[in-house]
Amino acid sequence: MSTDSESKRRAYREEKEGARKKSVKLAPEATPESKPDLPRKRYYRQRAHSNPFSDHSLDYPRNPDAMEWGKLYPEYANTDKKVEIADIGCGYGGLMIGLAKEYPQTMILGMEIRVQVTQYVEDRIIALREKHEKDEVNYQNIAVLRGNAMKFLPNFFHRGQLKKMFFCFPDPHFKQRKHKARIITTTLLSEYAYVLREEGVLYTITDVEDLHIWMVKHLDDHPLFERLDKEWEKNDKCVSIMYGSTEEGQKVARNKGSKFVACFRRVANPEE
């Protein structure tokens, strides 16, 4: 990122932080015109993908019980509610925002490894929460954290905690020697099966047919996942949201590209 872009982004964040503090002090007299604007992507530029095997400086809990969710979901800080929907590699947060309207009482988490993109989503959520503070859908149930799901997913979630997991337009890693870095592999699927409850659903969507075939094959071959048919996909509201709400999906649509969807149910563990 250029120094000029970085300084503009920093100035933008400082301006919005000042506006947020001012709005808190003047809350009783706040007007619709004083509501914060959504952040602008051009101040948060970053590469399209990040190497998951790099030694990123990441914070993660020792175990799920050590995770302080109240910092991300202040409205639920004194409740027993837990995250039940995870968007792995959430990008700019479009899917979470779409899901928040459909599941306003369900805690939804986006995990994103890229620094600038995570900061953008953080600011976007803050702005949405303040803009819709008194609305039925107030976006208090969505949050984002910077994390590497390929390494630390079990540090965040208990066994069987999640009911839905989304993998939207993941890095295709075209070169064969890079396939080990794909987000869907046999080893990783076992971890996803661990945090996904029985009858939970794993959703995938991509515009790369070769990657779609790869993901379907690995999920088909895994004993704890069973593919849901096209009729189920047609009637599932989350598929519709996933198909049209992500920024990458909208880009594919503008370019008249294809989208390949596959959804799998988490089946019961085999009897020992």
Curated annotation (Swiss-Prot):
Enzyme class at the top of the EC tree: transferase
Location in or out of the cell: Nucleus
InterPro entries: SAM-dependent_MTases_sf, Trm8_euk, tRNA_(Gua-N-7)_MeTrfase_Trmb
Recorded superkingdom: Eukaryota
Active site: D171
Catalytic activity of the protein: guanosine(46) in tRNA + S-adenosyl-L-methionine = N(7)-methylguanosine(46) in tRNA + S-adenosyl-L-homocysteine
Function: Catalyzes the formation of N(7)-methylguanine at position 46 (m7G46) in tRNA.
Protein name: tRNA (guanine-N(7)-)-methyltransferase
Originating species: Meyerozyma guilliermondii (strain ATCC 6260 / CBS 566 / DSM 6381 / JCM 1539 / NBRC 10279 / NRRL Y-324) (Yeast)
Gene giving rise to this polypeptide: TRM8
